[in-house]
Design a protein with these regions (language model features):
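Active-site microenvironment for binding and transforming phosphate-containing groups
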Residues: 1-118
Length: 118
């Protein structure tokens, strides 16, 4: 999404050196446990994506979503992307987390929506 957005912004006349990007609240690596199928999907795209995974429990990994997003922004030409540092799983009093709700056995979970226009 980020790379396509930046591509469209530059197509519309934006100077890439003036584009700033911040990755908003999202789940942090220590709380984002994924299976081998998730890992394999990323490695098929690029073997170097292994750097975004840490070993977890047997046959499980922890995915660095903010790190992956930051690198995607850098790959698209953004020189200094940032992350707010907010983990939606840990900061559940501020943000909704489907993963945390299911881990706690809650019957429902909140929803978030973002709208981006150019």
């Amino acid at each position: 999404i980020a790379q396509n957005t930046i591509k469209e912004m530059t197509r519309l006349g934006a100077d890439i050196s003036n584009i700033q990007a911040i990755v908003g609240p999202c789940i942090s690596q220590k709380n984002y446990e994924v299976g081998e199928d998730f890992l394999e999907t990323f490695l098929l795209e690029d073997q170097y994506n292994m750097r975004f995974f840490a070993n977890g429990k047997t046959n499980k990994y922890h995915f660095d979503l903010p790190g992956f997003c930051l690198q995607s922004l850098r790959n698209a030409g953004i020189t200094n992307p940032e992350w707010t540092g907010h983990c939606t799983y840990e900061d559940s009093d501020k943000f909704y987390s489907y993963r945390k709700s299911t881990h706690l056995g809650e019957p429902d979970y909140g929803r978030l929506i973002s709208v981006i226009t150019l």
